């Protein structure tokens, strides 16, 4: 079987279905693939293929996630759907499935439920820029006023988490009707309307290559007569020979110039997001740079030691801690390529964090790390992952 070539003729966007358990997220995912496949936008994927999602490991944490892809006239989409609530929490916090936008599924008969609220809150914390709502199972509600009340409740909930509740598209339908090919108005047509809303309301993300240059330093060596080389995988942007760079984190920020980019032992003029490269640096000694720092476009990122985080703490049976932790807990925080010790301060009113919780707290690191909001990290104790988190706000 030769692999199909991935043709990039449309902008790409990553989305996912979120919402309360049994409100129809997986059925909707199947309905989208089936409806768009009929219109020539990808392959139809059945419910049971999505539901038995494979397990993946991301930052030492096992997550079950199903990935499907499809196309509208406007975009190519990669779509994630998770079977369990804990998988969503882990996925959103570890950034395992980067979401540029989300489809919030709400059962019209139930209205917003606890996990509906939690997923919206997480979306806000991890920086999901836009949410579109699918009001599912509308054929199970006879009272039109009831549906209007639920819609109003969803808008208020979105607004309370700083999403534009009044402007958010809410599409009413039945994902099951679309899968079973009946009741076109609430079935197939609702899916077409939903995807139109997703196309228009979810903004096109900035591609990694269009962001400022950043490369986490993995290794450093000196080549006699040439200078110092830092190796790593370029996370974002483009680097060209002759451009200025900064070395940020751990110690005081230093400036240098890229005098060459190497890939597969060949010298290139430039490297871009996704490339594993060696970058030759002018006037930098072997000891001036170390793993844990980043090379970046000057003034694009700054080093910090204190931040607010949202984190998921592994349960005992996931290989996590057996006991809760309290303020003054001092694990290692693994950012990009390195562990840094930090101290946790829990918010007022939170006495402790139990294994299996997702929690908010403040961290103070012992050495500065180049960071910006939305940066993911693992929480480790002696090399063993006990949690994962995301920087939600930088303090100093």
From Swiss-Prot:
Mg(2+) binds at residue 26. GO terms for cellular component: cytoplasm. Residues 19-26 are annotated as: G1. It is found in: Cytoplasm. Residues 10-206 form the tr-type G domain. Keywords: Cytoplasm, Elongation factor, GTP-binding, Hydrolase, Magnesium, Metal-binding, Nucleotide-binding, Protein biosynthesis. Residues 81-84 are annotated as: G3. GTP hydrolase that promotes the GTP-dependent binding of aminoacyl-tRNA to the A-site of ribosomes during protein biosynthesis. PANTHER family: ELONGATION FACTOR TU, MITOCHONDRIAL, ELONGATION FACTOR TU-RELATED. This is Elongation factor Tu. The gene is tuf.
């Amino acid at each position: 079987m030769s692999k199909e070539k991935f043709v990039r003729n449309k902008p790409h966007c990553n989305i996912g279905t979120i919402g309360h358990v049994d409100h129809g997220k997986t059925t909707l995912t199947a309905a989208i693939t089936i409806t768009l496949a009929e219109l020539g936008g990808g392959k139809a994927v059945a419910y049971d293929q999505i539901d038995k999602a494979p397990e993946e490991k991301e930052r030492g944490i096992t997550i079950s996630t199903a990935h499907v892809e499809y196309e509208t006239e406007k975009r190519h989409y990669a779509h994630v759907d998770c079977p369990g609530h804990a998988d969503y929490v882990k996925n959103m916090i570890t950034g395992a499935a980067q979401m540029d936008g989300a489809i919030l599924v709400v059962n019209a008969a139930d209205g917003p439920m606890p996990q509906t609220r939690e997923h919206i809150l997480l979306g806000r914390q991890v920086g999901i820029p836009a949410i579109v709502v699918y009001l599912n199972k509308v054929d199970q509600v006879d009272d039109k006023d009831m549906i209007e009340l639920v819609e109003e409740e969803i808008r208020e909930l979105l607004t309370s988490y700083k999403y534009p509740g009044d402007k958010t598209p809410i599409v009413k339908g039945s994902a099951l009707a679309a899968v079973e090919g009946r009741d076109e108005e609430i079935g197939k047509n609702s899916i077409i309307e939903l995807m139109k809303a997703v196309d228009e309301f979810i903004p096109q993300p900035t591609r990694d290559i269009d962001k400022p240059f950043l490369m986490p330093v993995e290794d450093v060596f000196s080549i006699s007569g040439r200078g110092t080389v830092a190796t790593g995988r370029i996370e974002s942007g483009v680097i060209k020979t002759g451009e200025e760079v900064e070395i940020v984190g751990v110690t005081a920020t230093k400036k240098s110039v890229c005098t060459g980019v190497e890939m597969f032992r060949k010298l290139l003029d430039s490297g871009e997001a996704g490339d594993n490269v060696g970058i030759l640096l002018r006037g930098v000694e072997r000891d001036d740079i170390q793993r844990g720092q980043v090379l970046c476009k000057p003034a694009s990122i700054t080093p910090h030691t204190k931040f607010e985080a949202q984190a998921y703490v592994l349960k005992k049976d996931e290989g996590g801690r057996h006991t809760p932790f309290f303020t003054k807990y001092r694990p290692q925080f693994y950012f990009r390529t390195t562990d840094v010790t930090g101290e946790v301060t829990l918010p007022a009113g939170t006495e402790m964090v139990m294994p299996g919780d997702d929690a908010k707290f403040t961290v103070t690191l012992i050495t500065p790390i180049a960071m910006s909001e939305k940066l993911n990290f693992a929480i480790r104790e002696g090399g063993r992952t006990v949690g994962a988190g995301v920087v939600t706000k930088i303090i100093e």
